[in-house]
Amino acid sequence: MRNDKEEIEKIESYAKSTLGEMPEVIKLLGIHNIDMAKEQFRENQFLYLGRTNLPKKVLSLTALAVSLANGQTSSVMLHFKLAKNFGSGMLEVLDSIKAAKMSMMASTMSTMSSIKPIIEKFSGKNGNKDEVRRVMGNIKNESGMDSLPENLESLASVSFDLIGEHIQEKSELLSPFAVDQKYMFLMAFAVSVSIRYDECAKTYLTQFFMNGGKVAEAEDAIAVARFITGNKVMTSAVEILKW
């Protein structure tokens, strides 16, 4: 006969040794259904801290960035504490915050291609195509990329002020204080995967590889993004599980 109390005690012991503490959601799940608690912890290991291609510090910083982008306050603190336990300094934590902010701000470009015709219709102008091409050419040359996101060109057509601000943001927010440049792009990529903005995910992934990133490292980042994104449901259910 299965002893649920022993099962949850084993999970708690292992959680404390790997996470530093027992996540509240796993503890609460264990009260209601031990199998669901075990599944939650298994995912934590397989999709997060059990990954082996990225340093634990980078895994936790990536999880922190994705949690910040998803507004998961309780998870943010857990991943912050883990990052500190794995040796992250505050400048590296700030890099994680910057990567999350950049990805979220860039995601607003997802509507630019759709609203561009409306802007053109009601402004009575069709944009300066030569100037847009010049700006986009400069961005392409500076980035070293073969192609640029379609929505970036649409943003330039909608507003030169906004494209200039976007370039300034990218220069400031994706220039790391302490982490390797490739990890800055990897964190931004993971956030873009989580918020489902394809164009930025492709751009940041390309820049990650251009800065020496490996496919196996990208796989780990995708796993973390999947785990943290799905985990938003569980952390949001905490008050329900307390009943």
Where do the PLM segments sit?
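Hydrophobic alpha-helical segments
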Residues: 1-243
